[in-house]
Regions:
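N-terminal metal-binding scaffold of metallo-dependent hydrolase/deaminase domains
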Residues: 1-53
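Active-site gating loops and adjacent loop-to-helix segments of metal-dependent hydrolytic enzymes
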Residues: 84-112, 165-175
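A short, small-residue-rich loop immediately preceding and capping a beta-strand
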Residues: 107, 129-138
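Active-site gating/metal-coordination segments in enzymes
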Residues: 96-100, 104, 121-125, 129-130, ...
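Metal-coordinating catalytic core of metallo-dependent amide/deamination hydrolases
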Residues: 140-195
Length: 195
């Protein structure tokens, strides 16, 4: 039998209404989460729903915190994690001097794994739980990202960059191989866990 996890805190979320969403705030709220599935099964004012549960175990009271849904970033490039805020007088200069140099490192599986883990840890630290990210033209950059995401049970959307021009030769791939790699990635990762 599944146990629940209980979190008492201020809680903010939105509920769907006719034609939109309405913000809901509980100054002293209770969030009830199924420990097996990780799904929220109840939320409300502590005084309204707290007596309906056995709070003798798996109970955490955050007196100075706010619980809210994770943030979603709809456009990010995880391979550019280490070159964020690098200066370039123009986009092309920035790509040539920083981005393409960094992305070539993702041909190494260990490096791709390392950056995927650093990137995801940074997202979580800042409250972002879902992203839509570009990877690199290397298939292993996508595998590294999805492996790290799956271990954290995060919902992610990602894919392999298909690039056959205007970049260093090491980053370019031909259309046929890129297509085959993309099909393989889709077959391996699509709908796997939260991916």
């Amino acid at each position: 039998m599944s146990q629940n996890n209980y979190f008492r805190s201020s809680i903010y979320h939105c509920v769907e209404t006719n034609g939109g969403f309405k913000p809901v705030y509980f100054e002293d709220g209770l969030l009830v989460v199924d420990s097996d599935s990780g799904k929220i099964i109840d939320v409300g004012n502590f005084s309204d729903i707290g007596l309906g549960y056995d709070l003798s175990s798996n109970f955490i009271h955050f007196t100075d915190r706010l619980i809210m849904p994770g943030f979603v970033d709809t456009h990010v490039h995880y391979p550019q994690y280490k070159v964020i805020a690098s200066y370039g007088a123009s986009l092309i200069e920035w790509l040539d001097k920083y981005t393409f140099v960094e992305e070539q490192k993702f041909s190494d599986n260990d490096y791709a794994d390392q950056i995927a883990n650093l990137f995801l840890d940074e997202l979580i630290k800042n409250g972002t739980t879902t992203v839509m990210t570009f990877c690199t033209s290397y298939k292993q950059s996508v595998d590294a990202f999805f492996n790290a995401s799956e271990k954290r049970n995060l919902r992610m959307v990602a894919g392999k960059v298909m690039m056959d021009r205007n970049a260093p030769e090491e980053l370019c791939d031909n259309s046929e191989d890129s297509y085959k790699d993309s099909i393989s990635l889709i077959e391996n990762w699509h709908y796997k866990g939260m991916l």
